[in-house]
């Protein structure tokens, strides 16, 4: 019975996420209903002492990343830097290679620290223009943007500042550059297979006489290239974030040691920080802050007058994203404490391979919740100890666990109820019926890539 209750709680959360209801509201409802059916007297203590404790821990660790990332993306947008980068890349590669152009420019922006949602809004007008000039069906735009923004630059490439690559650092005491070779191999697999798939889809459509089409909704205004920011200046903040993230990642342990103790006159105790667990987060926070200041310094003319309103929207968006994921993390903490979850853990433990075990667990929960960070948070909150013990027994480095968890989170997360998918289709004026098939193909490629990387590790031992 306890197992059925646990599954019912997961199914309920999946249902409300799919229907578009607030996870912030329904994650605690799902968790506490499960507790109510087990032990009614435990509901309030579990809510305060477990659900909220887990939620607070997540916010404490990761909210600054959500906040600084959102502000960085917003000032990049307001300054016109993102438009300049997109226009430059497409101009260099050409409209005749529209798909590769859009994928690469989305790669550049997301790997530089711009949020996925900002990339969708920044890239779409240029994608529409390039596809129109190349007479490529508009319905292929979402799949193309998904390959560029929702895949390997989010979780595979070493050093990516996206949250999916940062969450594992606190569980496995790694940094954002964990397992660089495996990450690059996975990224190359997704890129090559993704481009091959999209090219095949384009040629099939053109062979059938299908072009860009007419009567579309959400058609953007023609892009004006007048007064675009110098592309070198526009790229500078992305370079600053990437370089300083690496520098601070190296320097943090040298400056603070493995553990740091700080005392202040007004405190009767020392503040103790595990630099092994927090170093990657601190490094990215400082790098994003430097990136924001770089944009403000070089793009203040475009930002002036709109900074206040723009950053308000960014802060609101970061709060929503962080609280959504924190609620799912709290949900995972409660579910992991229920008797029924023991059955789930035992079933997963029966999978003899720890990396396959981790990949299946994380990508399944990402699919259920419709969130890469949410699914990974639930899985690692509940099962990271089990993953670590199994990996240590098999002499698998924590870096490999990190990379597999990050890549698996970006596997089945992009199912139809995923927020980024819904936003992408809304912005492009297309429907699930028209374009989700291609997004799902990229989703399948991302999922397969995790197991390709696992296979490469076992065959070669490369990390």
Q: Which residue stretches match the model-derived regions?
A:
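Hydrophobic core segments of alpha-helical transmembrane domains in multi-pass membrane transport
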Residues: 5-17, 28-37, 66-71, 105-110, ...
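Short helix-coil transition sites and intra-membrane helix breaks within transmembrane domains
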Residues: 19-23, 59-62, 73-83, 109-122, ...
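Core transmembrane alpha-helical segments of multi-pass membrane transporters/permeases
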Residues: 25-28, 48-83, 108, 274-340
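Long, contiguous bundles of hydrophobic transmembrane helices that form the permeation core
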Residues: 38, 42, 181-310, 423, ...
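Hydrophobic alpha-helical transmembrane segments of multi-pass integral membrane proteins
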Residues: 63-69, 92-129, 322-330, 351-389
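Re-entrant/interfacial helical elements at transmembrane boundaries that shape
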Residues: 70, 84-86, 118-130, 159-171, ...
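Interfacial loop-to-transmembrane junctions
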Residues: 89, 424-445
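Alpha-helical transmembrane segments of multi-pass membrane proteins
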Residues: 96-109, 136-153, 179-184, 188, ...
